[in-house]
C-alpha cells in the first residue's frame, strides 16, 4: 500500500479559504513521481507536475494567496512566503554519503498578477491542541516581504535523519518553486530528473546489518521508504523468529508468568530480566545501558529483539524527560543508535501492583487466544471527532471520514461503525459497554480524560465491557503521560479489571493538530478538505489494514510517527518536528498484539498425528503466512512461517528429546489462533479415525468420520492384495495383554519337499534396505549364527537360526510370537540349504513379503498363511474381521469425555454452550486406544444456562407447593436444532426511528410517524418514543392521518408474539384510532390487509376544541398481539381519526414462537390396502396404483420397522408397472429434517425414489428434489423373512435402512416420490420422523428440586411441585434446570411449615382519586408481632418532629416545595414527596450535603426500613445519597457508617447542560429495604457527593420493629386478580370506566394465604373542564412572543436557552422547533411549537 500524491495547501487557525482559486497549467501532462534503477550504489528519480493551484485566503494579517502543487508540502521559514516542496524518506547504505545530481529540468516563470493573485501567504507554525487559538499570533516577517528577486531553497536537498532498525534513513527534498515577492512571480522547475548516488557505500556491511536486524514485523516501516525495493533480494526472511526483551519490576515475577508462557507458546523467543538483577538495576541510566547492550549483543548474533516490553510503573522503571517534549518518554530505551529512531517496538504494561498487571494480562490473553464468548463485537468500532470550534471541521471530521471511507465499513466486515463527527455526542460512550473492537478519539485531552465528549478515568472504572476488550487510540494531549501524579487515562483504561482496553496509544505531551492529522491519515497538505488515499502518504489507518503484514499495535504507532516524519520540513523546521512525535506517542498495554480487523478468518491447518524425536525441523501445514511455534511448558523449541504453498518448516532451536505432549500454536494477522497439542514419540500402533468433519446448526454439533482403515466397526469385510501367495488374517487377540500383538506363521508343506519358512521381526525398524535387502535373498552362502540375534528381536519359530534345520522352520503347522504393538521391519524367509541361500518369500510376486515400517496394532492377532502361487511363493494379504464390536469410539469435548462405546461413525450433541470448542474422537481397542483426532467447532449464541423464573413456595398444613415460570430471557443451551431464538426485535426509539424501519405517509399530507423526545413527548418510562398526529401544532391544525410504521424484515416461521406500549399524547384528546397488521410478503401499504388488532384509544374525559392540547399525557397501555407463522413484516397504522392530537408508540418487542413438537408417523392408524390417513397421495402416472398402507398381519412376507403397518408403492404387482407416485405430508412448517426407514425387495432392489419439498402447495409441480437414490445390492439379511406369495418367485424383504435428510428453510410440505423404475417390486416406508426448529418445548430440559440442600426430585417437566408430610420448621427449597450441556444456577425460596393463623389486611378502603378516573386502595398491614414504628408519606409536608440539616450551608435543604415553582414533585403513587436539589432551574448547580432525620425511634431489637426513591429527571439521574442509623444523637456528626449508599441509575446520557431539567420523564421510583441495627434511635437520609443533576425525591418511609416483612399483597377487581407481589399498603388502579367495583386484597405469606378483604367503590364521570393557560403565546412570521404574569424562557431542541425574562419575552427565531417554558404562581408550563 503506497501513497504518492499530496494535495493542496494548509489552512491553519486564523486562515479561512475562499472559493476563489485559479489553476496554472504547467508543462507536464500528469503529476508523477518515479524511482528507477534502484541499487546499493544509486537510484534515479523523476518528478513532474501538471498544475499549480492558487487559492485566495483571508487571515488575521490580511488577504493572501496559498500556492499548492500536487504531491508537495507547504514549506518555508515562519513568517516568510510559503511555497510547496516534495519530501521522500530514503534508505542509505552503510558508510555512504548520499549525493544528488540533477540531470535535467524545465523552468518557467509565472506572473501571479495575471491571475489576480495576492502575495503568497506567510508560513505559519504548527498549533498545539493546548493552544488558545485566539491567543496564537499571526506571524508575518516584513523583511522577507521586502526582498527582491527569486528566493527559495536549492532544487534538491538531502539530510541524514538516523538509523531505524538497521536501515539508515535520510530525507530527500525537491524544491520546485521559488518566489519573487516584490514582482509577485513564481519560478517553477518541472520535469526534474535526478540521480542519487551513495558514495562510499559498503554493500556487504549494509546487507549484514539488514540481515542481522531484519524482522517481518518491521515491514510496515520498510514499505514507507521511497527506494525500498533495494532490499527485495533479501534471503529467506520468514525464517527470522520473533524475539522479545522483557524488563520488569521484581514484584511482577509471579503475575507475569501466564503472559510469558503464552508469548513463548505463540513463538516469541523471550529474554526476561528483572530490576533486582545487578546488571539491570533500578535507575533509568542502568536500565537503559542494559537494554542497549542487549540489543547490540543480539544484533551481533543476528538475534536482535523485535519487541521491548517494559513492565511496571515509573516507580520501578522510570522514564526520562524528552529532549523536545520536556515530558516523560520511553523512547531512549529503544533508540540505541543515538538518534530519535527506535530500534525496537517498545510498549509499557504500566501497573503499580501485581493485581493491576494481572488485569492487563487477562485481557490480552483472552483477546489473543480469542476465547471471548461473543466475537461479534469485533465487527463494531467507535470513531469520534471531538469538539473544537475550528479544528473539528478542519482536522477532526476529515480524519474520521477518511477512516470510514477506506477501512471501517461493511466492505471490510464491520457491521456497526459508531461515528460521532460533531456535537451532539449523546450516548457515544455507551458503545464501549456494549462492545467495540476499536475506539479512536481525536480532539482535546487531559492527563485523566478525553475532553469533549468527556470520558474520565472515573467513567473508565465504571465500564461494563467484560469479555469485549478493545484497542483505544487517543490523538489528543497528555492522555499517556504515565508519570502523572495519579494514573493517567491510558494507564487506567488498560489497568481496570474485566473492562476497558488491552492496549492504548496516546501522547505523553501536548499533541498538535497538523501532526495528529498526518499521524492518522498520512502526510498531506490539506486542512479542511477531505483527504484521499492517493493524496496522502501511509498513515496509521492505512498501516492497520496492510495485508500480509504483521500488524501489531506498535507498528500502527510507528506508521503514524513515520507519517509525521514524512511531513517534516527540510532545513526550516516549522512543524513541531518528527523528533517530538517519536518522543510523544506511547503504547500502554501490550503492543505486540495483532489487532483483529472485524471478524478474523479461520486458519486452515493440518497437524501430524505425532512427531518423532531429534529432528532439526518439522513440516506443518497452515494458511500461507502463518507463524507456527512448537513449545512445551512455556519453553519455545522452534518456529517457522508457512510459505505460499501453506507449508511451514519449523526450525528447531531446541531439539525434542523426550516423549510427551507439546504445544503447537499457529497465528497470523487477522486470523483466529490455532492452539493445539501434539504427541511426540513412536507412532501409536492403534489406528485412529480419518476424515473427521464437524458441522453446526444452532447449538447442535454433528461429527462424522471414517473408520480406521484396518477394519470397519459395522462388520464389513475388506481384502487387500499384497502379492501372490501370502494371506494375513488379522483378528482380535483376546489372549494377549494390553499393548501386545500376536504374530502367527502357518504353512502346510507348501512345496511338498519339507521346506519351510521363518518370520523375522526387527523392533528397531532400521534393517530394511541393509540387513533386509530391498530385492533378492536375505543372504547367499553361509551366514553368521548371530545374524538373527544381532538384528531381529522376535522370531517365528522361536528357535529360528540362519543354520537351517527342519526343527527351526515352519513346514507344516504354525508357530507364533507375542510382540509389543508398534512399528517393525520384517521379512518371511524361505531357506534353501542345498544352495546356501536364504530366500525371501514371494520374490516373484507383485509385492515381496518384506516390509519397511509395518504397524502391528496392539490387541490383534496376525496370522500369515503361506501358500503356493504358480511357480513361486508370492503374496496375498487378506484382512478379516468378523467381530463388529472389536473397537468402539470415544468422543471428547474440550478435553472432557462426553460419549463412549459408539459404534456408528457419526455423533450429534445438542445444546452445546456457545463459543469455541475442540471435539476429539478416539478409537478404543481391546488392548489400547488410538491417538485422538480433533476438530475445532464454533457454536454461536450465549453461554448462560437460564434458571427458572418467579419461584414461589407456600404451605398448607404439612404440604408444600412450589410454582415457577419456565426459563426465559436467555438462549436455552439444550437439545434443539435452534434453541430459544430469544427476542427477534426490540426497539425503544431512544435514537429516533431506525433506518431499517419504513414509514408510509399514505394520505400524502407530509406528516407521517416521527420520533419524539421530551420536553413535549415523553416515551413509556423513557425519554423518547414515536408518534403520529391527527392535529398539528404551530398553525398546522386538523389532520386526517393514514400513516404506516413498518418493522424491518422478520424471521418467524412459527409465528411470534408482539408486545408494545401505546398512549394518547393528550388524555383529553385521546380517541386516536389505530391497527396492527402482519404481512408474509412485502412491506408496502397494499401488503397489509387484515388487522390483527384494531381499536380506538379510550378518552378520559369530555373534550373541548379550545383546550390546551398536549398538557396531560394519557396513560400508557401495553398491548399483546399473536403473529401468524411466516410473518415477515408488522405494520402500525394510524388512521380513521381526526382533530385529536398525537398517538404515541414505544417499546416494541417481537419474540419468535417456540418450535412445533417433533412428531413421527407410524401409519398404525391407517387401514391395510388404503391410502395412508392424514397424508395426500398423487397417482401421477394414472395406473390406479399409488401409495398404500400394508399390514404385516395381512402379508406373511412383510415385516414393519415398528408396529405392524407400513406404506408401499409397487413397480411390479403381478405385472410390470411404471410408477410415478407421490406421498405428501401434512403441513410441517418449521421442520429442519426428516428421518425415515425404507426397505425394498432384496433380490430386486432398484426401486428409485426421491425426497421432495414444497414451500407453497401440494400439487406435484410445487415440489423440488432435495434427496434421491436408487437402492442397490443391500444383501443384509432376508433369511428371517418368509417367501412372497404375491411375487414371481422368492423375493425376501431387505433390512430396514435409515436415512436422514436436511430440509431447507421455508419447507411446508414433504413428499416421497417413487418413479424412474419398472418391473422390480416395491419400496416400503415406515416411522417417518420430522424434527422441528424453533425455541425449546417444555420437555427440552428438566427440573430438579432440592430441599435443604438434598435432591428430592429430578426429571420434572411441569412448572409446579408438591410435597406432603414435610416436617414443621423452616425449609429452603431450590429448583435447578438441567440441560444437556450443563445446569442452571439454583433459584431458592424459604418455606415455613407450621399452623400459624394467616392474618388478613386491616382497614381496607377504596376511593376515587380527585379529578381522575382512578381508584385508590389503602389498608393497614395485617396484625403481627411486628410493630409499625413510623409511617410517613409527606402529604402534609415535612413533619415538625423530623429534622433537616443544611450541612453545606447554601440555604437549600430537603423540602416538599422545591423552587422555582414551589409545587411538590409527584410522589410515589401520590401527589407529594420530599426532595433535595443538586441543580435548581434559574439558579444553577448545587453542591448539596443535606440530611433528613427521623424523629426518635425505639428499636431495641432492630428493625426494617423501607422507602421509595427516584430522580426527578431521568436524564439527570445520577444523584448520590446514603442512609445512616444513629444510636446516640441526631446531629450530622452522629451519622458515620452508611447502611446503604448508592448513585441512582441514569436512564440516558445528559445531552446539553442547558436542557430544561424536570420537564421530561421522571425517573423510575425504586423501593429500598434496609435492616436497622439493634438500638437504632435515629435514621438519616443524606443527599451529597454530587452536583449539577436535578432533584432527588424520597417518599413513603416506613419503619417496623423486628424482621423485614414476610408477605406480599395480591389485588383483585370484581373477583379478577389485577396485581400481585405488592409490598406497600396502597394501590392505584387507573383509567376506569364509570360504574361500581368490588376490590379485594389478599395477604400472601411464604407458607400460606389470608382471607380476602373487600371494599366497594362507585366511579363517577368527571365534569367538563376547559383548561385556561395563564399565559399567551403567539408566533407572527418568525417572531415568538410570550406574555405572562411570571417568568418565560424560550429553548431550542438541544436544550439551549435562547431568551428569558419576566412578563413579556420576544424572540426572532430561525425555522425549526422550539420549546417555551412558563412559570406562573409556582407552576411550570411547557409548550412545543414550530416556526416555518
From Swiss-Prot:
Swiss-Prot/TrEMBL keywords: Calcium, Hydrolase, Metal-binding, Protease, Secreted, Signal, Thiol protease, Virulence, Zymogen
Entry binding sites for Ca(2+) 5: 1433, 1435, 1470, 1472, 1595
Keyword flag Transcription: no
Record-level GO cellular component terms: extracellular region
Leader sequence residues: 1-24
SUPFAM superfamilies linked: Caspase-like
GO terms, biological process: hemolysis in another organism; proteolysis
Residue numbers covered by the propeptide annotation in the UniProt entry: 25-228
Catalytic activity: Endopeptidase with strict specificity for lysyl bonds
Binding-site positions, Ca(2+) 3: 988, 990, 1022, 1024, 1146-1147
Site residues (Cleavage), renumbered to this chain: 228-229, 737-738, 1156-1157, 1291-1292
Top-rank taxon, per record: Bacteria
Biased composition annotated in UniProt, kind: Pro residues: 970-980
Class in the EC hierarchy, top level: hydrolase
Residues engaged in binding Ca(2+) 4: 1001, 1003, 1005, 1007, 1043
Entry's EC annotation: 3.4.22.47
Coiled-coil regions, chain positions: none
Active site: 444 (proton donor), 477 (nucleophile)
Post-translational modification: Proteolytically cleaved into a catalytic subunit and three adhesins. Arg-gingipain is involved in this post-translational processing.
Residues that hold Ca(2+) 6 according to the record: 1446, 1448, 1450, 1452, 1490
Region: Disordered, residue numbers: 965-988
Gene Ontology molecular function terms on file: calcium ion binding; cysteine-type endopeptidase activity
The family this protein is said to belong to: Belongs to the peptidase C25 family.
UniProt comment concerning the protein's domains: The isolated adhesin domains have hemolytic activity (in vitro).
Protein name listed in UniProt: Lys-gingipain W83
Native source organism of the sequence: Porphyromonas gingivalis
Gene: kgp
